[in-house]
């Protein structure tokens, strides 16, 4: 049926060519506007050489050619007008650029005129828009369908009217709109869907139709076709079954312009402007790939003029923030659809769509009341932002009938209930220590999606995400198909208690923003609709469409002693006031501190401070003339309740009120003005290195005690301050913009190792002073110093400037055997006697305090303390009050005599000495009454500073800090490591937990211990604002600490000599002791770095990830982080500043794969068995059970038996014996697989007596197990990961009764627990079907076949694939199934199959051959067009062993004429060949194509830049070959028989591609393929089944720019059209630009009738392929891009002679070497190929291991200087013919033992390929297997 069509096409083709030749030369402006890669039918369009060459350069080249050419007069005349044409073209092009400003996509209506765009996701309410312009009344505008079933959309012009024909399953509908639309003007078209309603709008005129049926989905998005504009790809002509409307292929193509194609191309995605489909979007698995689907920049756009290059939106899209650019005649405009921006270019941010709800207002719509149909969709989404202080309230409700979704705020968490069909689901997101009623904005997203599992069961996935961090997901399975919504309530309802699924009974109070409800592509912004007065939305109450930007009533919580806020200076003056509310349970803390500079006549700097001391409020006020300190509260206020404070002053007079009780006071001196020019500090004074000064009278500041509690309603001099806004932009981790109370924080005894827990404000305070441990929970070992009597430690405070204090607090622990010794001593300036001394005297502790001339001694300790045990000393001073306590004994108190508060109670401290008093410079002992200390000290805390920990973190160099300088001669003692605490095991690299944000704004303190055997993994990560982040990772067994404060990332690495992945505990400590000092300590390895940047704060945001991040986040991590997987192992003893969180109970984002405790290294450890094998402990060993791993071996590490299921359907079936059909209450199934199929059945288990079954399947790329044990279908799946990614996955399924679990790889375990009663027994398990399932109506057809690899299948410990290998009688293998090995070694993208190595002697390795698959999914390979994929150069191989055969020599019969071979590199003149210069010739390919299959198809030439391509066509019968080429006005034709040897090119030319073999009984034509570019030619081949001979033809072309059309005709009894990919050079091998021809002598075969003569035409300039077929005077043409060449005939002849001689010499040498090699290896037999043997023979000892293999570009580069011509291909082809015949060891025989391998000079064919009695090619020495259809994935390529 296709022969007449092909003939008609050929006639049309010839008519088009004839018409082209009689047309005048084409306009130059059209020529310039074409794509550089464009290939035209019209020869006149091939006149230009390269778009990169100027006209003058081309003209000068033409002048140089005249020196050696006889140019016809018509050519001279043509070139005289050439410059005129060029100038004219420039002017016309300039004018055309304005005319075609918005030309869009141009189509000329030719046979190959069409565009391909991404799939249209129609949903149930999708839209599609475009504009078109044409002058033709008929043409196909757009087409898309469901892949060939029922549904389609066809948009076409019919007699000037636009007709939409569509089918949604209920029958075709037709809508026609418009008339005379072919007027050359732009027309706008819209296709709108709304469930069953479909509308067509043209220029505002609308028509609509309704579709009848049960559902209105448009196919399935995964299998739907692309969108084709202007026409259909040609390959559909032979694949009509893939079209839902086959007649569309015969529609006339559109001729005109298309622009502004807008639609949604992803589920849930927004509409956007579409562009031509790019290469990464091309998928060739569903249908044969052809050039019509290749990207525009990599294929010649035949039939499309200029692409979209003149479209203003394409050249420069002015739209911002995702606006859709629309081209118009007046220029581009922007449509800001569904955006938060507007303006001309969508550049202005819209006012937020928000509203304030106060409990009586809400939004709603009810479609049922208006009689409208509900909104129906396959997926919907709800998203909004909310802010509230109320813990309960209805947020959103939607439903229809009994289906509902109720979203509310309950107890400060987000609560969701859903009912669908008969299933109900409920979730409550309330992370640990996190509440959402904190009056901060929170984002909520709810997404539902329905997936059809079977015809009666669907699966609804529900995902809820809060703040993009806190996630919960679940699913419901049942008999439903769609999601419906007819009612919606936002913010409340008339009676929220009556709504289905209600868990709260109150309306929402607070603010809502951007409330959006989307159903498929429908998107409703409900607040915007209400604000604009939409009739759809009903508004209850007086709704205010705005939210206050800030509220002074918003509270903040200071969570640590160091947390604080910095406010701008407070403008005070003579009168001022301050008021606020506070609450806390901690007795001490500085609340407000504001200072000013000292005035010239003032006594002191001005100051105001408010502190909480011993549970009371104290006011400090100094106007410069004297300080006053007043206690403002009469009772304690540290009771956890809110308290009000008001302070007012007028000059010196002031009064303060706490909870309404006023107290007046007056400042001393004559100062009346309070001028505060410094920052105001709230909650604390910051880290020790802050340059903040305060008087000694503010005791809490001296003791570094910040306020921990809540603060709100701050008003300064009548101005309300939104302190929550400051908290959000400053230290948001430590200062929370909310206030909540956590009671009983000491429950559960959080303090370890004997620490004492005290109730703080929402935090436990652990007193570790009586223990050997420190840290937030007394879990970390203390730093211990050892003194030997001559060692000491000295601390200079304030870098030697010293400090003045009225209070001191000291804690120190010691251990000694000496009765006396100096423990601690402070010193002041040399003229000051102030000091504090703590010493051991006679075995007791003495504290001596001296202020000026007053001194007081306290003695404590009832027993002797020099007992070499640890003792704790606590000392404190409050002005004149002293307190000393040793261990747990009652404290000793005392008071300094005759002191008053103020100057006389102030102590000057310049330095602190431990262990002894030494001179700073000379280190000689100064006069002291006490001996130096001998023993150990630890746990020193002096005025809130842990100096021993600071010194240890600074390392041995003791870098100076802004707050202190150190000198140390004592040594640190390595304390014995304690037991890890809060240990957790990360069982997978995909697991992680989330904690509250790391508190690292001013300082960093991170400690943890870890143990692992994995060398890499992310341990800690916290992102931040801008580029700030902090991360800790394990890289190659070493710790990397990376951070960025805004000055660029900095990475610190440990310098340990050992790798940390040794399954031992390792300690990591990270500190920031100074503003620019960072330290990393890993075990004993210490690193320190000092930065020079100006940024002082680490501004983090989000949560702190421990053990990894979610998988999609790795690609977004900063480039300085190398981890791409998480941590697997044990993590413990995590201390983060003042907190020690548990990785399980305190995680705000928990993980089921992170469990408490460390599954440590016992005999049966977690690492004993690989791949999650089950370790079984035995008496003195362990064993690994591998049934649930898909692996095997003693440790579950070895690969299991694997089978590959091809595209032609196949199945492995196991039938249980009748006596073994068991009833099972538990089932365990595991397997590994690799596939790219998005929909397939991997496994099905059936019952013999009931409908029970288990089916493991892939649905839309997700893995599901659906099982039924007597009641209903129960689906269980992993939705979060796609498995059709060609990667190896392991799935494990376990069932116990009705409950089941499924785990994919190392991801979270998915569990299913049916709520209703279900049967628990699977009855009479009868058979297992692997690779698909049988259809219900019979046992012959396989439904939903699997294509890929399945390995290690275990069903209840029964390894079915192992039984298949053992040929178990209960196993049946059907169809395209074969055993494979090396599954895990495969490339990620392609497959490699290999067979066991040869057992024959002398065989070093497997032989290999390569071919190409078709990529065809059809069952019948004859329906598939040949593969036309462009290779990457790194394809895979299929090793195949070829047994040795006896070497034979067959004499050649018949005529073998080198002149009949193809030319290579040279130009054929009058039937002779000559060598080309090496500057003109470029290498090609001389490889043989592997004969694989017969195929038929028809296509039109279309080429593109690509890599190696090979197509081999096998036909039977005697063939006469006629080859005709047309280039410009030139052509050539030849016919004849070709010699029986292959041809190999010399180094100065490309390899031959046109050699053939001929005997009286057969004709064989073989050529090779080169790597450069490909071209499609329309040709015909013949085949008959009665002949016993075979003809193999391969045509190749190498090109750098688009080649001309090639007409090749093979004449035979009947004509069968077929497609040929022409890769490489011209027919018969060529260089990049040499277009070679194959000529067959006339005297051997009669010529078929030639087409009519072609009228002469002005010859064009030399095309990009060089060489004119008929013009014999153009032999010296030099391809573009090359340097100068030889111009004289004598020089060329000399070069030819030199080349011939050199070729003969090299050939002789190679022949000798080859003969010697064959003699020395006579016992070996290989199937080799000529060029491979030579190319690798001189370089690679394994040359003979290469069989018939196509090559890639790198191979050609390697070989081109090592090969010489043969077979008439090169300059020395005839001279080498005899040598080639000597090497030729066989011919293609006609019988079972047949012989000839390849030919050519370097061939050593072993006769391995012959022909059987049936005429089919057969491997000699092998028993031929049963014929099996070959599919695209049976053979892969791997170029070596």
UniProtKB/Swiss-Prot annotation:
Topology feature Extracellular, residues: 1-1696
Phenotype of the disrupted gene, per the record: Viable and fertile albeit with reduced lifespan. Reduced synapse number and impaired synaptic transmission. Neuromuscular junction (NMJ) synapses appear relatively normal, but pre- and postsynaptic densities are incompletely apposed. Reduced active zone formation in NMJs during embryogenesis. Reduced excitatory junction current amplitudes in embryonic NMJs due to fewer synapses. Shortened axon branches with fewer boutons in larval NMJs. Long intervening axon stretches devoid of synaptic boutons in NMJ branches. Increase in number of GluRIIA clusters.
Record has Phosphoprotein as a keyword: no
Disulfide bridge map: 313-325, 319-334, 336-346, 511-547, 710-739, 746-757, 751-766, 768-778, 1130-1158, 1164-1175, 1169-1184, 1186-1196
A Pfam family of this chain: Laminin_G_2
InterPro entries: ConA-like_dom_sf, EGF-like_dom, Laminin_G, Neurexin-related_CASP
Compositional bias segments (type: Basic and acidic residues): 24-37, 1632-1646, 1831-1840
Record topology, Cytoplasmic segments: 1718-1840
Record note on quaternary structure: Interacts (via C-terminal PDZ binding motif) with CASK (via PDZ domain). Interacts (via cytoplasmic domain) with apolpp/ApoLI; the interaction supports apolpp/ApoLI protein stability. Interact (via cytoplasmic domain) with Spn/Spinophilin. Interacts with RhoGAP100F/Syd-1 (via PDZ domain); RhoGAP100F/Syd-1 may recruit Nrx-1 to the presynaptic active zone.
Homology family: Belongs to the neurexin family.
Protein name: Neurexin 1
Gene (name only): Nrx-1
């Amino acid at each position: 049926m296709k022969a007449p069509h092909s003939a008609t096409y050929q006639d049309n083709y010839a008519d088009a060519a004839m018409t082209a030749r009689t047309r005048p030369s084409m306009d130059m402006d059209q020529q310039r506007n074409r794509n550089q890669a464009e290939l035209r039918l019209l020869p006149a369009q091939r006149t230009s050489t390269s778009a990169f060459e100027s006209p003058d350069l081309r003209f000068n080249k033409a002048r140089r050619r005249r020196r050696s050419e006889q140019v016809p007069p018509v050519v001279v005349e043509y070139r005289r007008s050439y410059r005129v044409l060029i100038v004219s073209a420039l002017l016309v092009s300039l004018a055309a650029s304005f005319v075609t400003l918005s030309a869009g996509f141009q189509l000329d209506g030719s046979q190959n005129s069409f565009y391909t765009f991404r799939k249209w996701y129609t949903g149930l309410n999708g839209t599609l828009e475009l504009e078109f312009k044409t002058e033709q009344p008929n043409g196909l505008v757009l087409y898309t369908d469901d892949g060939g079933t029922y549904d389609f959309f066809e948009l076409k012009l019919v007699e000037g009217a636009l007709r939409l024909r569509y089918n949604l399953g209920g029958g075709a509908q037709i809508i026609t709109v418009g008339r005379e639309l072919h007027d050359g003007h732009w027309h706008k078209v819209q296709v709108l869907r709304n469930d069953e309603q479909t509308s067509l709008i043209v220029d505002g005129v609308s028509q609509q139709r309704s579709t009848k049926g049960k559902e209105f989905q448009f196919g399935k998005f995964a299998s739907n076709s692309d969108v084709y504009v202007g026409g259909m790809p040609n390959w559909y002509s032979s694949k009509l079954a893939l079209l839902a409307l086959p007649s569309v292929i015969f529609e006339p193509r559109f001729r005109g312009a298309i622009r502004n194609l807008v639609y949604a191309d992803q589920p849930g995605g927004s509409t956007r402007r579409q562009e031509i489909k790019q290469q990464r979007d091309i998928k060739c698995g569903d249908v044969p790939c052809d050039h019509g689907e290749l990207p525009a920049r990599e294929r010649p756009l035949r039939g499309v003029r200029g692409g979209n290059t003149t479209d203003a939106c394409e050249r420069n899209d002015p739209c911002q923030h995702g606006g859709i650019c629309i081209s118009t005649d007046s220029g581009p405009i922007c449509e800001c659809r569904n955006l938060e921006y507007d303006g001309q270019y969508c550049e202005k941010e819209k006012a937020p769509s928000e509203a304030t709800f106060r409990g009586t207002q809400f939004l709603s719509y009810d479609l049922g009341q208006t009689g409208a149909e509900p909104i129906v969709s396959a997926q919907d989404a709800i998203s909004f932002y909310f802010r509230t202080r109320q813990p309960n309230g209805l947020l959103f409700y939607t439903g229809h009938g009994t289906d509902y979704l109720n979203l509310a705020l309950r107890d400060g968490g987000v609560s969701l209930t859903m009912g669908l069909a008969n299933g109900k689901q409920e979730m409550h997101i309330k992370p640990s220590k996190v509440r959402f009623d904190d009056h901060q904005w929170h984002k909520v997203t709810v997404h539902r999606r329905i997936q059809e599992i079977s015809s009666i069961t669907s699966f609804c996935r529900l995902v809820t995400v809060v703040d993009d961090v806190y996630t919960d997901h679940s699913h419901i399975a049942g008999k439903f198909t769609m999601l419906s919504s007819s009612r919606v309530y936002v913010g409340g309802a008339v009676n929220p208690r009556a709504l289905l699924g209600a868990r709260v009974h109150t309306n929402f109070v607070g603010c809502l923003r951007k409330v959006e409800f989307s159903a498929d592509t429908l998107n409703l912004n409900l607040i915007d609709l209400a604000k604009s007065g939409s009739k759809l939305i009903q508004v209850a109450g007086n709704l205010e469409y705005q939210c206050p930007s800030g509220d002074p009533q918003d509270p903040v919580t200071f969570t640590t002693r160091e947390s604080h806020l910095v406010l701008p200076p407070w403008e005070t003056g003579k009168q001022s006031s301050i008021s606020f509310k506070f609450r806390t349970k901690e007795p001490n803390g500085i609340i407000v501190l504001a200072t000013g500079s000292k005035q010239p006549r003032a006594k002191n700097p001005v100051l105001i401070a408010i502190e909480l001391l011993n549970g009371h409020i104290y006011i400090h006020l100094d106007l410069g003339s004297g300080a006053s300190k007043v206690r403002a509260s009469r009772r304690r206020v540290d009771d956890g309740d809110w308290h009000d404070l008001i302070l007012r002053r007028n000059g010196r007079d002031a009064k303060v009120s706490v909870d309404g009780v006023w107290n007046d006071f007056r400042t001393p001196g004559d100062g009346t003005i309070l001028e505060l020019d410094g920052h105001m500090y709230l909650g604390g004074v910051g880290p020790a290195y802050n340059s903040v000064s305060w008087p000694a009278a503010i005791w809490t500041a001296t003791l570094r005690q910040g306020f921990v509690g809540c603060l709100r309603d701050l008003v300064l001099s009548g101005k309300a301050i939104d302190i929550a806004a400051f908290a959000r932009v400053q230290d948001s981790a430590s200062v929370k913009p909310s206030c909540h109370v956590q009671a009983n924080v000491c429950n559960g005894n959080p303090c370890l190792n004997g620490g004492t827990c005290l109730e703080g404000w929402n935090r436990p305070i652990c007193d570790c002073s009586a223990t050997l441990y420190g840290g937030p929970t007394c879990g970390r070992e203390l730093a211990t110093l050892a003194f030997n009597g001559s060692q000491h430690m000295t601390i200079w405070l304030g870098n030697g400037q010293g400090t003045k204090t009225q209070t001191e607090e000291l804690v120190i622990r010691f251990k000694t055997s000496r009765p006396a010794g100096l423990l601690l001593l402070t010193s002041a300036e040399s003229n000051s006697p102030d000091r504090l001394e703590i010493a051991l005297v006679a075995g007791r502790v003495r504290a001596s305090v001296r202020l000026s001339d007053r001194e007081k001694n306290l003695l404590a300790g009832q027993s002797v303390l020099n007992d070499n045990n640890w003792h704790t000393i606590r000392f404190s001073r409050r002005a004149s009050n002293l307190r000393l306590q040793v261990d747990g004994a009652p404290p000793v108190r005392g008071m300094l005599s005759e002191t008053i508060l103020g100057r006389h109670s102030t102590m000057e401290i310049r330095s602190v000495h431990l262990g002894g008093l030494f001179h700073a410079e000379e280190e000689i002992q100064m006069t002291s009454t006490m001996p130096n200390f001998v023993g150990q000290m630890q746990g020193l805390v002096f005025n809130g500073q842990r100096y021993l920990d600071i010194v240890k973190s600074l390392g041995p160099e003791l870098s100076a800090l802004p707050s202190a300088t150190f000198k140390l001669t004592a040594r640190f003692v390595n304390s014995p490591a304690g037991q890890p605490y809060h240990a957790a095991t990360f069982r997978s690299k995909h697991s992680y937990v989330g904690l509250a944000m790391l508190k690292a704004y001013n300082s960093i303190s991170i400690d943890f211990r870890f143990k692992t055997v994995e060398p890499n993994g992310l341990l800690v990560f916290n992102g931040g604002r801008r580029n700030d982040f902090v991360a800790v990772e394990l890289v190659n067994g070493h710790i990397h600490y990376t951070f960025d404060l805004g000055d660029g990332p900095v990475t610190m690495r440990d310098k340990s000599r050992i790798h940390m992945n040794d399954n031992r505990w390792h300690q990591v400590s990270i500190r920031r002791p100074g503003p620019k000092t960072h330290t990393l300590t890993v075990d004993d390895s210490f690193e320190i770095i000092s930065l020079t940047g100006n940024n002082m704060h680490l501004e983090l945001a989000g949560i702190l990830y421990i053990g990894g991040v979610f998988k999609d986040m790795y690609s977004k991590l900063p480039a300085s982080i190398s981890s791409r997987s998480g941590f697997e192992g044990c993590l413990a003893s995590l201390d983060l500043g003042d907190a020690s969180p548990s990785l399980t109970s305190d995680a705000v984002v928990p993980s089921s794969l992170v469990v408490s405790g460390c599954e440590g290294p016992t005999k049966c450890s977690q690492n004993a068995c690989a791949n999650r094998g089950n370790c079984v402990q035995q008496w003195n060993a362990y064993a690994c059970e591998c049934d649930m791993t898909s692996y095997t071996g003693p440790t579950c590490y070895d690969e299991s038996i694997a089978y590959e299921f091809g595209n032609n359907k196949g199945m492995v079936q196991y039938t249980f014996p009748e006596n073994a059909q068991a009833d099972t209450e538990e089932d365990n199934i595991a397997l590994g697989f690799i596939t790219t199929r998005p929909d397939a059945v991997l496994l099905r288990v059936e019952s013999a007596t009931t409908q029970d079954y288990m089916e493991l399947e892939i649905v839309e790329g997700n893995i599901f197990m659906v099982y039924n044990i007597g009641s209903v279908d129960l689906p269980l799946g992993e939705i979060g990961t796609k498995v059709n990614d060609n990667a190896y996955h392991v799935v494990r399924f376990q069932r116990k009764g009705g409950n089941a679990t499924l785990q994919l790889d190392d991801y979270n375990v998915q569990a299913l627990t049916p709520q209703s009663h279900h049967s628990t027994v699977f009855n009479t398990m009868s058979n297992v079907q692997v690779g698909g399932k049988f259809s219900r109506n019979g046992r012959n057809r396989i439904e939903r076949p699997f294509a890929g690899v399945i390995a290690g299948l275990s069903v209840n410990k029964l390894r079915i694939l192992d039984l298949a290998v053992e040929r178990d009688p209960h196993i049946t293998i059907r169809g395209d199934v074969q055993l494979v090995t090396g599954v895990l070694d495969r490339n990620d993208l392609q497959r490699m199959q290999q067979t066991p190595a040869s057992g024959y002697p002398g065989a070093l390795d497997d032989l290999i051959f390569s071919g190409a698959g078709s990529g065809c999914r059809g069952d019948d390979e004859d329906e598939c067009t040949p593969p036309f994929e462009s290779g990457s150069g790194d394809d895979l191989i299929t090793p195949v062993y070829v047994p040795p055969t006896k070497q034979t020599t067959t004499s050649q019969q018949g005529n073998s004429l080198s002149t009949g071979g193809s030319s290579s590199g040279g130009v054929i003149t009058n039937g002779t060949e000559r060598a080309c210069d090496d500057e003109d010739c470029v290498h090609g390919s001389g490889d043989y194509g592997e004969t694989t299959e017969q195929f038929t198809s028809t296509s039109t030439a279309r080429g593109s830049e690509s890599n190696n391509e090979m197509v081999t066509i096998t036909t039977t019968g005697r063939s006469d070959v006629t080859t005709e080429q047309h280039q410009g006005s030139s052509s050539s034709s030849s016919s004849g028989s070709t010699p029986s040897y292959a041809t190999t090119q010399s180094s100065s030319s490309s390899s031959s591609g046109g050699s053939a073999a001929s005997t009286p009984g057969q004709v064989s034509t073989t050529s090779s393929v080169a790597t450069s570019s490909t071209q499609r030619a329309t040709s015909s081949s013949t085949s008959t089944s009665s002949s016993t001979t075979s003809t193999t033809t391969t045509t190749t072309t190498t090109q750098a720019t688009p080649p001309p059309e090639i007409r090749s005709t093979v004449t035979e009894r009947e004509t069968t059209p077929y497609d040929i990919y022409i890769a490489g050079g011209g027919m018969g091998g060529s260089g990049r630009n040499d277009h070679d021809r194959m000529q067959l002598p006339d005297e051997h075969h009669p010529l078929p009738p030639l087409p009519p003569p072609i009228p002469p035409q002005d010859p064009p300039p030399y095309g990009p392929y060089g060489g004119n077929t008929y013009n014999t005077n153009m032999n010296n043409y030099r391809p573009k891009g090359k340097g100068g060449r030889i111009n004289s005939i004598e020089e060329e002849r000399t070069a030819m002679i030199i080349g011939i001689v050199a070729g003969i010499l090299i050939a002789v040498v190679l022949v000798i070497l080859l003969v010697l090699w064959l003699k020395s290896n006579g016992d070996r037999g290989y199937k080799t190929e000529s060029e491979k043997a030579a190319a690798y023979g001189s370089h690679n000892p394994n040359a003979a291991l290469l069989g018939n293999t196509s090559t890639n570009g790198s191979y050609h580069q390697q070989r081109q200087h090592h090969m010489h011509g043969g077979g008439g291909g090169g300059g020395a082809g005839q001279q080498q013919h005899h040598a080639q015949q000597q090497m030729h060891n066989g011919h293609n025989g006609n019988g079972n033992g047949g012989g000839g391998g390849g030919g050519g000079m370097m061939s050593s064919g072993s006769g391995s390929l012959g022909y059987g009695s049936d005429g089919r090619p057969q491997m000699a020495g092998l028993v031929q297997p049963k014929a099996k259809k070959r599919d695209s994935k049976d053979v892969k390529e791997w170029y070596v």
